[in-house]
Amino acid sequence: MKKFIIAVCCIVVCVLLFDYLYYYQGVYIDFSPNKKPITFVCTKGEKIYLDEGNGFEEFEIKGVDIGSGMPGEWSTDFGITKSDYLRWFKQIKEMGANTVRIYTINNDVFYNAFYEFNKDNPDPLYLLHGVWVNDYLYNSARDAYDPELIDTFINDCKIMIDIVHGNRKLQLGRDASSGHGTYNKDISQWVIGYILGVEWEDVTVVYTNEKFKNNEKYNAYKGKYMYSTQDATPFEAMLARVGDEAIEYETKRYKTQKLVAFSNWPITDPFTYPQYITDYFDKCASVDVEHIGCTDKVLSGHFASYHIYPYYRDYLAFVKDFNELSFDVDIESCYKDGTLNTYKLYLKAIADHHAIPVVISEFGVPTGRGIAHIDTNTGRNQGHMPETEQGPALVACYNDIIEAGCAGSCLFSWQDEWFKRTWNTNYAIDFMRTPYWSDVQTNEQYFGLLSFDPGKEKTVCYIDGDVSEWSEDDIVMKSDDLTLSMKYDEAYVYFLAKKDNFDFNNEKLYIPIDTTPKSGSSYCENNDLRFDRAVDFLITINGRKNSKIQVQERYEVLRANYAKEVYGFDTYVKGNIPMRDSPKFVDINIILQMSQLVDGNHLTEAEVFPTGVLTYGNGNPDAKNYNSLSDFICNGDYVEIRIPWQLLNFSDPSRLQIHDDYYDGHYGIEPINIDSIYVGVSNEVTDQRIHLEQVEMKGWENKVTYHERLKPAYYVMQSIWREKDES
């Protein structure tokens, strides 16, 4: 009996040891060292070819980038369910896409769903799989050859390869940017390639190159499958090593090869520019995959991957003389109706530069109310774009990509992502709470073809003039001829103002709002209005074109953070601090550029956008005249209004958290919590004070509600891609 117990224990230990070494550590024995590798995907010249059973045929990647975030979840929570993925894969395929791209190792849920969708599907989806570089390692004081960075990078490539072949287990918490689970589904037959790395930080590239520029060991790499040329920088040689080890690992262990690419973007593009552009954009680094080659042992090939948007960074929009550029461009072919399409021009320059296929692995335009960059040539801006214009803008981008000679593209992105933040609004919010509300002022959250609208089945209010969704319970104040109602959800505060016999074209409506007890004014000198308590914001409804929301001078968040850039002075210097009860109400703007480049001259004056201007229109997605940017609409005696939380200086509405007084010992943004606001309504200027009523409010913490909705752009892209497939 004793021997039996010992034997059983030994067997258990051996099984556990095998499980640990094989599935957790990737240890294996090659029992077929002489078996030749195969591939079903390869490159030839500037094209990609795929063998789907009838031999190699030219293949255009028509892809969609899928993030890992959901409302109420961080991307690193990997909260998307199997049923979500299966539904999305079906919709993506029906749109006409043939490929999806993910950026990092997801939870096993993704791979199980991908396998189930494809296993009996005669027309499967293909996958481009990314390998993320650890944010902490990459943004710390390390060069690219630091063992913690490059060794982790290479190891993650091998783990990812094991995962797509169904031979890996990962523990929860192994890496903040990585999923976990048991990966036992072999999806490799649908994986066409790997995009390794991230949008490289220029300072890391420069630091690496400068540190090792005189060290021959780091200036060249020659591997069995990949090598760097004599023109390669140390950083490019590092990439060659990573790619070589990834290809070697898959070739030896799984006897197959996929395409390999390295992530890139305009900040590290391979070009040099005139000095005034270099100085303005701080263009200091280049990564050129033409300096990385494949040996004859590579059956698949490699391609150049770029994230390129029409507005960032639009170097060519500022070129005074195109003869100054380091590359040849066909300018005449990029004019349309007398306007130079610099996006197409840049794409052509990229495609012409490379002798290998070019895939634009990210392109897109967001539909958020906020805005971060303006495309001065084609109007494909980063934000403040109606959903109905997103589709045509995406089609224009896609056509530019194909006409430039690229081998494929991936549309960014499939779904909106509430957790995202962007540089020109993140100072105003609690960025540890972004997944728990829909911040329409942050454009980065709204690139998706799939929208997550607040409300379990429908939104609490649509700005469409239909007042049937309002009830007596929503009324917060009432007088002889005026009534004001209010409600809110994860994205907006909604108002319904009713004025008997209201003449929209000739009358005004004023809605004062008091949020903070720390400041505000009982008088607005702009409109000669008086209030019975200190007011922080004033909504003025003045026809279709002149309606706006303004903020009391002391509570202007743009001034508190960008006074020097926008106004040319330090607002925290004594004499510049606005009075606590200043009667001046100012327009609400959002910063776009910290400085400007005009005719080659670098101007220190910042560029701003009037985000407090209210847009008239129908905000119901089911309406024929739908405008997703609409802020208000009038129907007879009724005016419906919706105001984004951020315009009211809420840093986290899920917890009713607003900005504290910027000048009362804080010198910037600090949060305070409230449990109510005060609102009022008036339609005339009189000596009487406008009365404000208290409205009790309650946050929702982490319990968000939402429902999915395909944006119009989905159907626009569907018509383009499906028509192309049928032709």
Regions found by a protein language model. Give the residues of each.
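Active-site-adjacent substrate/metal-binding segments within catalytic domains
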Residues: 26-119
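Aromatic-lined substrate-binding rim segments of carbohydrate-active enzymes
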Residues: 81-161, 242-258, 327, 336
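Active-site groove signature of glycoside hydrolases
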Residues: 143-144, 159-233, 254-266
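A solvent-exposed, charged loop/short amphipathic helix patch at secondary-structure junctions
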Residues: 148, 152-158, 205-237, 318-336, ...
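Glycoside hydrolase catalytic-domain groove-lining segments
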Residues: 282-377
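Aromatic-rich peripheral "rim/lid" segments of glycoside hydrolase catalytic domains that contact
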Residues: 371-379, 389, 400-476, 708-727
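Short, well-ordered beta-strand segments enriched in hydrophobic/aromatic residues
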Residues: 465, 492-500, 637-645
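Surface-exposed, glycine/proline- and aromatic-rich loop segments on solvent-exposed faces
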Residues: 476-597, 659-684
